[in-house]
Amino acid sequence: MEPGPTAAQRRCSLPPWLPLGLLLWSGLALGALPFGSSPHRVFHDLLSEQQLLEVEDLSLSLLQGGGLGPLSLPPDLPDLDPECRELLLDFANSSAELTGCLVRSARPVRLCQTCYPLFQQVVSKMDNISRAAGNTSESQSCARSLLMADRMQIVVILSEFFNTTWQEANCANCLTNNSEELSNSTVYFLNLFNHTLTCFEHNLQGNAHSLLQTKNYSEVCKNCREAYKTLSSLYSEMQKMNELENKAEPGTHLCIDVEDAMNITRKLWSRTFNCSVPCSDTVPVIAVSVFILFLPVVFYLSSFLHSEQKKRKLILPKRLKSSTSFANIQENSN
């Protein structure tokens, strides 16, 4: 119910003695002033009867949860101008929408493909606040009031949180250069991913409604093998392209949407369906391994067979020759 004009006029024109009356009345209520026969006696020398009644009514309204409203604030308290407050509300609404989108797209991860328009909107609102000059002096401009006026800096914290989340998700890898739409490679990968999941669902045996309820997945492994191999090959190509484009930044990833989609597919294929894709390079790898293993044996065997076998010749020592010749001389002399 809206207050009448008389009450509104009385609130807008509060007498100057009212703060003093409230202070004394609160002191009496808290026991700071001595009690007499009645509270009127305490204020008899300070306030008239009518003024005292007004103080009592106002004190009761404050104790019951009422307040003085904006009139209780100092008249020189700085406040935002309408244009700056509108910028703050725009940023608040955009932040709320982006936060809801991020939470709803957490599992399965769809952050980049679902929330990129809202992220661009938040970035735009933050740029508007940073560039706002306000209608007052430079020291109290809109940007300074919203971004640097207090220790918490809530607007700055929210903006940094959104930017950090976007960078860690590497959503720029899923978008075009101007970040206005999904890239062609991302759209193609997501289409193959949806096609592979559709193949899984159509080839499940039985009437189960969930991927995790059936036990026989032979039809899934047989009929969806090509779809899975195509998706896996495309993912490997995207990884190689990303590594070539980011040579100066090792450890970069694809966007979180693509990585999570591939992880889901591999988990279903390997763990849930227990399928396996035979490697076409198995035979050449085994042949090369066996050849390298027996190469030393072949080398030493061929060396032994083709080397010249020389007979051993006994060579007598020189001392033995001299002693033999000396013995012959003695025999001849005798």
UniProtKB/Swiss-Prot annotation:
Glycosylated residues in this chain: N93, N128, N135, N163, N177, N184, N194, N216, N263, N274
Modification comment: Undergoes proteolytic cleavage in the luminal domain, the cleaved fragments might be linked by disulfide bonds with the remnant of the protein. Highly N-glycosylated.
Phosphoserine modifications at: S322, S325, S333
Ranges facing Lumenal side: 32-284
Pfam family of the protein (one): OSTMP1
Record's keyword terms, sorted: Glycoprotein, Lysosome, Membrane, Osteopetrosis, Phosphoprotein, Signal, Transmembrane, Transmembrane helix
InterPro entries xrefs: Osteopetrosis-assoc_TM_1 (IPR019172)
Record membrane topology: Single-pass type I membrane protein
Domain of life the protein comes from: Eukaryota
TM region(s), chain numbering: 285-305
GO biological process, one term: osteoclast differentiation
Localization in the cell: Lysosome membrane
Signal peptide (from-to): 1-31
Any one cellular-component term (Gene Ontology): lysosomal membrane
UniProt main location, coarse: membrane
Residues in compartment: Cytoplasmic: 306-334
Disease: Osteopetrosis, autosomal recessive 5: A rare genetic disease characterized by abnormally dense bone, due to defective resorption of immature bone. Osteopetrosis occurs in two forms: a severe autosomal recessive form occurring in utero, infancy, or childhood, and a benign autosomal dominant form occurring in adolescence or adulthood. Recessive osteopetrosis commonly manifests in early infancy with macrocephaly, feeding difficulties, evolving blindness and deafness, bone marrow failure, severe anemia, and hepatosplenomegaly.
Family as reported in the entry's similarity comment: Belongs to the OSTM1 family.
Described purpose of this protein according to its UniProt entry: Required for osteoclast and melanocyte maturation and function.
Quaternary structure and interacting proteins, as annotated: Chloride channel 7 are heteromers of alpha (CLCN7) and beta (OSTM1) subunits.
Protein name: Osteopetrosis-associated transmembrane protein 1
Lineage of origin: Eukaryota, Metazoa, Chordata, Craniata, Vertebrata
